[in-house]
């Protein structure tokens, strides 16, 4: 399958083909993938493959979207672009909770309303980006200072 077929076939079990195609088309356009929909996923650049993974999840209308290290392997420009995509998803899909797990704090700070920092399996802090950025325990953990 090209990736268009893969997405449409993923959604067919729930909806009529026409409705499914409309949802998939909108999601691909939102992610900037519509023009290349007939390509094979394996031939896409890495950043586009990550976007495609997000599209495949979104077309199922989830209440929770889990993004596990979505910026892994991306350069700074790709990470910034991805952060913009995540913000757009959040703004457009008000009924969805997006859980982002990532070590790229610039991405986390730019897309999250609430952040929980986990350090070696223990919850270190929870708060909005400003609170986390100014939390001395978080700063110390980031710098490797302390116990």
Name what the model sees in each region.
Residues 1-147:
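Glycine-rich phosphate-binding loops of nucleotide-dependent enzymes
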